[in-house]
Amino acid sequence: MADVKFVKPKNINGHFVKIKCRDCGNVQVVFARPSSTVTCNICGATIAKPTGGILATSGEVVEVL
């Protein structure tokens, strides 16, 4: 299994973000400051994890809500 790089996106002022899974392309709404790991509803891959503040994501931020 390859290492997945998680990055903290910039300019997230909203409370929710739409994130696109890099494995299956599914787009789902995620809280911008999660307290637990977020997995994709379709393939089960980890798409976001908590960092003590803003989320760290392995997918693409599609939209800030």
Swiss-Prot record:
Keyword line: Metal-binding, Ribonucleoprotein, Ribosomal protein, Zinc, Zinc-finger
Which example biological process does GO assign this protein? translation
Q: How is the cofactor bound?
A: Binds 1 zinc ion per subunit.
Q: Which cofactor does it need?
A: Zn(2+)
Pfam families, per database record: Ribosomal_S27e (PF01667)
> Gene3D superfamilies annotated for this entry?
Zn-binding ribosomal proteins
GO terms for cellular component = ribonucleoprotein complex; ribosome
The entry lists its GO molecular-function terms as: structural constituent of ribosome; zinc ion binding
Cite the residue ranges of zinc fingers (C4-type).
21-43
Q: Which SUPFAM superfamilies match?
A: Zn-binding ribosomal proteins
User: What residues bind Zn(2+), as annotated?
Assistant: C21, C24, C40, C43
Q: How does it assemble?
A: Part of the 30S ribosomal subunit.
Family, similarity comment: Belongs to the eukaryotic ribosomal protein eS27 family.
**Mind telling me what this protein is named?**
Small ribosomal subunit protein eS27
